[in-house]
Amino acid sequence: MSSTTLTQLEHHDEFISRHIGPSADEQKAMLAELGVDSLEALTKDTVPGAILREPFLQTGEPQTEREALARLKNIAKKNQICTSYIGMGYYDTVVPNVILRNVLENPGWYTAYTPYQPEIAQGRLEALLNFQQMTMDLTGLDLASASLLDEATAAAEAMAMAKRVSKNKKSNAFFIADNVYTQTIDVVKTRAEYFGFDIIVGPAREASDHDVFGALLQYPDKQGQLHNIEQLIGELQEKKAIVAVASDLMSLLMVKSPGEMGADMVFGNAQRFGVPMGYGGPHAAFFATRDKFKRSLPGRIIGVSKDSRGRPALRMAMQTREQHIRREKANSNICTAQVLLANMASFYAVYHGPDGLRRIANRIHRLTDIVALGMQDKGVKLVNSHWFDTLTFEMKENAADVLARSKALGLNLRVDGEGMFGISLDEAKTRDDVESLFAALFGDNHGLDIDVLDSRVAGGDVESIPADLVRQSQYLQHPVFNEYHSETEMLRYIKKLENKDLALNHSMISLGSCTMKLNATAEMIPVTWPEFGQLHPFCPAEQAQGYYELVSTLSEWLIDVTGYDAMSMQPNSGAQGEYAGLLAIQKYHESRGDGHRNICLIPSSAHGTNPASAQMMNMKVVVVDCDKHGNVDMDDLKAKAEEAGENLSCIMVTYPSTHGVYEEGIKDICDLVHNYGGQVYMDGANMNAQVGVTSPGYIGSDVSHLNLHKTFCIPHGGGGPGMGPIGVKQHLAEFLPNHSIVNIDGPKAGNGAVSAAQFGSASILTISWMYIAMMGGRGLREASETAILNANYLAEKLSKHFKILYRGRNNRVAHECIIDLRPMKDAAGIAEIDVAKRLQDYGFHSPTMSFPVAGTIMVEPTESESKAELDRFIEALVSIKAEAEKVAAGEWPKDNNPLVNAPHTLADITDAEWDRPYDRKTATYPVEAVGYDKFWPTVNRIDDVFGDRNLMCSCPSIEEYR
C-alpha cells in the first residue's frame, strides 16, 4: 500500500510548480552553483536580517486552477447583468469574436512589452499606428497619441498640456463646461489643485466670458445635446485660450468633428470600439491635437521611420518628451498606457471599415430617434433638442413607476435628478430592447409600434442632427481600413502582425524592473466572463456585489502582503498610483497644518516616473546621491533632509533598489526621513523581491503602489493595461481617492478621484485574484525566493565574463542585476544598443538598457523562467562577448560586424550578394540553441534620428512598402 495521503494526491499546490520555472532538480543544481543547499538559505544570505521575516502571509492555502476558477465563478455570479442605458462614457459593445479570440485571449498579443525594441515589435506598432490614424480621421486633427489611461485622466492631461502651450501666460484659470461628464470634472479638479490652477465650472456658453488659459467642452455633452461649438471655440482662441473637447468616437462617424470646428485637442474613450465595459476598464483613451503642439503631447506616439536598408519601419517617436528620459521635466508621468485595448479598438475599425462603422452608428442613431419620437408621442418632455445616441427627459409625475418597472425588467436608466432621466443607446441594443424600454417608461400597454415609428423617422419626422453638424468629411480611407472585412482576411492580418512581435510565448523577456513573469492561462480566463465584462461602473451597488467581494478580498490579501492598513484600487497604472500616494501624503501634511512641506527627496537611481509624479504635485525634487556600491548615500541623504528641514514632505525610494540589491540601511533611511517629519513612499516596482519575504510596512514605509501588471501577473499587453493600487498606513487611509459618483468606504467623502472609475480597470483585478488564490501564501514566498535564485544564478554564471556592477550582502544580488558593458565599448566600440539588437538574432528581447546606469544592461529573469531558458540566455550573452572580442582584436571591422549590423533579417541572408566579413550562419544562427523555431526580426535596425526629424505618425501609403 502507498503511504501517499489523499491530500497529497489532491495536489492543491499544483499551480505553484506550473508558475515557477525551475524544477526541484534544477533548483538543486542552481543552488549548488551558488554554494547553498536551499532556497531558505539563499534568502537568508541575500535579504538583510533586519527586514527578513519568517513566513507570515495569511492568504490561505494554494488552490488548483479548477478550484480557484470555481470559487471566482461563484463570486462572479453575485454580479447582475442588466441592460445598461447609463452611458456617461461607458457603453455595451459587441466584441468581434475574431478579435476576442485572436487578440484579447492571445498571449502573442497580451504578453509583449512596451515596444522599446521596435525591430521585434512591428506588429503591435502597426496596430497602434492604425489606432492613431483612426483617431486623427475621426477627430479631424493632425496628430494622435497611441492611447492614454482613460477619458478623465486624458482630460487632466489636456489641461496640463493647455497650460504648456497657451499664449495666455498670465492666466492660471481653466474653464470646464458644466455639461462635461461628472467623473471627468472630478479628476480634472484633483489634478488642478496642486498645479495651482483655478477651476471655473459653468455653462459652456459662458466660457469666453472668462480670462482662462484653456477650456474643456464636451461634444456631444453629458445630456446628449449636440451644439455647434465652432463659434465658441473661435471666441476662446481669440482670447489666447486653448480649447480641448471631450468627444465620442461613435458619434464622430455621423457628426462634424471637433477638429473641423477648430478644437486644439480632442480626446475621449475608445471603449465602445469593441472593448467590454468591465465595470470601468481597462479601456484606451484617445488623444489628438494639432501638429504645432506635437512636442507637448502626452503619452506614446508611434512614428514611421526607416531601417538600415531604407525600408519603412515603425518606432516610438519623440521619446525625449517622456518620463523615462526627462524625469521631472516630462510632459506627463505616463509610462504604461492601454496598448492592448487600443489595438482591440484599432482592429475593430479595421474589421468593420468605414462602411461597417457608419452602419453601426446609423443603427444606434435610428433606435435613438425611434425612442425620442415615441417619447414625444407620449408627451414626455425632452431636455435636448438634438442628439446622437443620448436623451435626457423629464417624467416627474411617473418617476417612481418608471424606476420600479425598469428594475423589474432589468434596465438601468441614468437618474439625473428628481424626475429627470437619461438614456444612452449603443451597438448592443436591438428593437427588442426598445420594446422593453417603452414598457419600462409607459407600461406594457404603451401602444407604440416600432415599425410605424421607424417609417416616420425615415420620412423626416425627426431632425436630431442639425444640418450644420452632419458630417461631410471622409474618414478611414487608408487601404488598411478597407481590405480586411471577411473573417478569413482579418484572421490572417492579425496573425501576420502577431508574427512580427516577440512576446513571452516565444522566449524570456528579462527587462530589469519590469518583471515579465508568466501570465497563466487560468488567470486570464475570467477576464472575458460576461459577469465581469458587462457591468457598467455606475450601475446600482446591489448589482455589483461580486465586484465588491472581489475588491474586498484582493485588498485584504494585498494588505497582508504589504504590511499596510488600507488599500485603494482606483489608480489604473503604476504612475497613477505614485500620484495618488503623493496626493495622500500632501493631504496628510495639510491636515496637520504642514501644507508648506513640499520637498521630495529622490535617489539618483529612481525610476523616471518618480520625479515626474512629484512635479505633478508641485513638489520640489531634490536628488539624493548614491555611493559607489549603488546604495543611497546616507551622508548626502542626511544633509539634504537637514537642509529641507520643515519643508521635507517625503522620500521616494525603490526597494530592492534599482541597482539590484537589498540595501542594508533601508530601515535607517525610513527612520531618518520620519525624524525630519517626512513620509516614506516606497515604489512598488520591485515588489517581486519582497512578497512573502518582507514587506514595505514592516520595513517602515508609509505608502506604496503595487504594479499588478508586474508582481501580480496582469500581462503587460505590449504597453498596457496595468493597475497601480496603493497601500497606506492607517494615518494616510482617510486621504485615499474617493469618487464623485460612487462613494467608496474608507476615504473621506469629497476626496478627489484620480481615475474615471471608482476601482480603475476593475475587470483585470480578476487576474491578480486568481494568481494569489492559486499560489497561496506559501507559493507567493516561494516565487520571491525563486526570483532571487534565478537572478543570482544568472549573475554567478555571467560574472565569469562580465562585471556585475552592484552586489549586496554576501556578494548577492536581489531579483535583478546590472551587467557592465562599458569595458566592451572601450575595447571594441560595441555599445549597449548593439548588444540589445544582437540579442534579437539570438531570439531574445534585450534587458533594460542604460538604466539606472549608462552603458549597462539590467537583467530580471523572474521566477517563471526555467534553468534551460536561463542557460540559453547566458550562452547568448557569452557568445556576444566573444564576438565583441573579435572586433577588439581586429578580426572584424568596428563598423562592419555582426553586432553593429544587428539585427539580421531574412532580406539580409537572401541577398544575392553577401559582402560582410562574417558568414550568413554567424549572422542568423550564431549558436546551436538558435534552432528551427528561430524568431526573425522583420526589419533591420531602425534609424531613430531620421524618425524624429521626419515625424510621420499616420499610416504610410501602401506604395512605401513596395
UniProtKB/Swiss-Prot annotation:
Residues recorded with modification N6-(pyridoxal phosphate)lysine: K710
CDD domains in alphabetical order: GDC-P
Cofactor: pyridoxal 5'-phosphate
Gene3D superfamilies: Aspartate Aminotransferase, domain 1 (3.90.1150.10), Type I PLP-dependent aspartate aminotransferase-like (Major domain) (3.40.640.10)
A Gene Ontology BP annotation from the UniProt entry: glycine decarboxylation via glycine cleavage system
Keywords from the named record: Oxidoreductase, Pyridoxal phosphate
Presence of the UniProt keyword Oxidoreductase in the record: yes
Top-level class of the enzyme under EC nomenclature: oxidoreductase
One GO cellular component, as annotated: cytosol
Name of a matching Pfam family: GDC-P
Molecular function GO terms recorded: glycine binding; glycine dehydrogenase (decarboxylating) activity; pyridoxal phosphate binding
Coiled-coil stretches: none
Catalytic reaction annotation: N(6)-[(R)-lipoyl]-L-lysyl-[glycine-cleavage complex H protein] + glycine + H(+) = N(6)-[(R)-S(8)-aminomethyldihydrolipoyl]-L-lysyl-[glycine-cleavage complex H protein] + CO2
E.C. code: 1.4.4.2
Xref: InterPro entries: GcvP, GDC-P_C, GDC-P_N, GDC_P, PyrdxlP-dep_Trfase, PyrdxlP-dep_Trfase_major, PyrdxlP-dep_Trfase_small
Family listed: Belongs to the GcvP family.
Cited function: The glycine cleavage system catalyzes the degradation of glycine. The P protein binds the alpha-amino group of glycine through its pyridoxal phosphate cofactor; CO(2) is released and the remaining methylamine moiety is then transferred to the lipoamide cofactor of the H protein.
PANTHER family: GLYCINE DEHYDROGENASE (DECARBOXYLATING), GLYCINE DEHYDROGENASE, DECARBOXYLATING
Record text on subunit structure and interactions: The glycine cleavage system is composed of four proteins: P, T, L and H.
Name used for this protein in its record: Glycine dehydrogenase (decarboxylating)
Gene (name only): gcvP
